[in-house]
Amino acid sequence: MSKKKEEAKALRTPIVAVLGHVDHGKTTLLDRIRKSKVVAKEAGGITQHIGATEVPLDVIKQICKDIWKVEVKIPGLLFIDTPGHKAFTNLRRRGGALADLAILIVDINEGFKPQTEEALSILRTFKTPFVVAANKIDRIPGWQSHEDTPFMKSYAMQEDFAKQNLENRLYNLIAELYQRGFSAERFDRISDFTRTVAVVPISALKGEGIPELLLILVGLAQRYLEKNLRLHIEGKGRGTVLEVKEERGLGVTCDAILYDGTLKVGDRIAIAGKDEVIVTNVKAILKPPPVREMRVESKFQSVKSVTAAAGIKIVAPNLENVLAGSEFEVVESEEDIKKFEERVRKEYEEIAIRTDEEGVVLKTDTLGSLEALINELRQEGIPIKKAEVGDVDKRDVVDASANKDELNKVVLAFNVKLLPGVEEEAKKYGVRIFSHEIIYTLIESFVKWREEERLARERQKVEALIKPGKIKLLKEFIFRRSKPAIVGVRVLAGELRRGVDLIKPDGTKVGAVRTMQKEGKNVAIASAGDELAIAIEDVTIGRQLEGDEELYVDVPERHAKVIERDLLDSLDEETKRAFKEFLEIKRKDNPFWGK
């Protein structure tokens, strides 16, 4: 065998994750690649895997024939198309992402949506290189589609009006990526693909732009990922579990991606379970039938062995407690099992160990989602008391209730069930449960609630403070001189509340406001500009007061300190001035008063 052939064989198929918001075109893109005219000619050229589609290099070359200029060693591309969030959060392996590359599909006309945000945050967590497919260019006003044509060729045939519409949408999309910390540009304007995210305008429906999209993926894999694609063909099989599900007639099975080595029927494998490492023997390895028959569900082809990279279904005993998102490995000895157990334990600790004494309780469906959510919560500065995989039980509620801060008495549940009695327990202990199937939405709703609660508490604190106020006694409205003195006043600045003490400009205490009446009705509070009658205790007009003075609300020292430190900017100018005058009165004898 020539050296060149050996090299080609030594590189495994790169794994490409296809991510994006629902209805933005993930399935349409893969369907288009599967059903392109080329594929029809090369009967059976594309292999359908469990949760994945393998596109060999020959097919990619045919699709890209008009623009193919590169010498390539990789055998093709394996696209992972597991539905829903699982495609995001389970695509993990030790030391990062299971996917070597990703396509982030965004509807160019709609821009970013919650699942787009989620996909980006996971790509960031796992440091996965990605390309943005700006889909649905066929819906841009004025755009004339040319089926299966490279984007640049189609773009050259468009009217200026359509080109401008495309550029405007691209500009918005690139700006959205930039706001999230990614430098991006249209693919043909990039010189260094390691520093800038390539944006490829495509129509998954019409096939436009798909040649460039595939070419860029192949180029990125070939140029920047070659080291990661070295394959130990004879080595032990290693992979990641995408989903654990029951199949009629087979029992509980694992859908998995084999990313290294070879897996054979009869191999002994170790997989991370919910409470312990599960060691079992592979009874069967299943793959779907060829593409042309793939719509026939429930029919699988049994194979004796499989080499990476591949999407497979593993049939084996004792898979009930396997964790989706966890790794599996072929083990040949007790020592192998011990090493695997130690690695799993360390990995789980690395993900969940950095917990805080005070913080929220986090429960997720997989290790991948746990890792992604911890990362997102840390970025938001939210403390985490406990982070685990599994359904929410009463113990989680009790743990959350033990927090001192009410804002941390929270359970965040991502794509897991609330076990019976949990909601009643939460009501009993005053614990809030947030549950959602989209990471971005779960965190957004929690952060929004937390901020609203924090502001409500601040408002309550502010409400409880005695605020600054300045009043003028109206001499022509002295209704009673003593026991209590009743006099008309005008509020000059700030506010006047029932029960506050009053002082003179020289600091002499006057007495407390017992009651307040405005237009014959009792009131508890009056604001600047109001005129009303007030009853003042322990004072006689004509002795302690003349009846035409300006008086200040005697703000307690503790309250004055908070107002000066935290609330000064929220006061209007008149109130601010009155408060400063009040502080000067107090600090005449004691310069450190209220500091």
Swiss-Prot record:
Keywords: GTP-binding, Initiation factor, Nucleotide-binding, Protein biosynthesis. One of its GO terms (cellular component) is cytoplasm. Residues 45-49 are annotated as: G2. It comes from the Archaea. InterPro entries: EFTU-type, P-loop_NTPase, Small_GTP-bd, T_Tr_GTP-bd_dom, TF_aIF-2_arc, TIF_IF2, TIF_IF2_dom3, TIF_IF2_dom3_sf. Residues 11-225 form the tr-type G domain. GTP binds at residues 20-27, 81-85, 135-138. Residues 20-27 are annotated as: G1. The keyword Ribonucleoprotein does not apply. GO terms for molecular function: GTP binding; GTPase activity; translation initiation factor activity. Function in general translation initiation by promoting the binding of the formylmethionine-tRNA to ribosomes. Seems to function along with eIF-2. NCBIfam families: aIF-2, PRK04004.1, PRK14845.1, small_GTP. PANTHER family: EUKARYOTIC TRANSLATION INITIATION FACTOR 5B, TRANSLATION INITIATION FACTOR IF-2-RELATED. This is Probable translation initiation factor IF-2. It comes from Archaeoglobus fulgidus (strain ATCC 49558 / DSM 4304 / JCM 9628 / NBRC 100126 / VC-16).
